[in-house]
Amino acid sequence: MRRPLRTAAAAVAAALVMVLSACSLHVPTDPDGTLDAVQGGTLRVGATPHAGFVDVAGQVGPDGAVSDDQVSGSEVDLVRGFARELGAEVEFVVSSEGELVRRIEEGSLDLAVGGITSKSPWSSKVGVTRPYTEVVLSDGKKHKLVMLAPMGENAFISELERHLDRVTGKTQAGEGR
């Protein structure tokens, strides 16, 4: 009687493995497909001016649109490097943090940068990366910097965090190499 039970259990286990394999279950996932949309496409980035991190030269269009050569800074360089890794073009929009968060929520932006700290008030509305560096800001205090992305788009955020870790020399545990 035990042998048929073991055979049945093995058959169920094998069937379960086949079903899960057929589902192509990938973790982490992006419910809205942000990473897939950006790869080989366009990375839509919202930038709020913050000296050294995001600098903007010239006129900003009425919808916040700027040409690629109008934006510079350390975070702009990080974003451009990430886009290169994904084979994507970068499209920048300049606005306030609040407006950028609104645009991420509505799906018209993939990422927001601009000296945003880990104490950001936006974490209940959008996804926040792990801190990727620590800097002293104008208040004289150390702050951990993060980037903002669509809430729940974990594959996109994970890929961004891996890029930031590689560029900044961090390991998964957050320590330098």
Functional labels for PLM-detected ranges:
Residues 55-57, 122-124, 159:
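Short glycine-/acidic-enriched loop or helix-start segments at secondary-structure transitions
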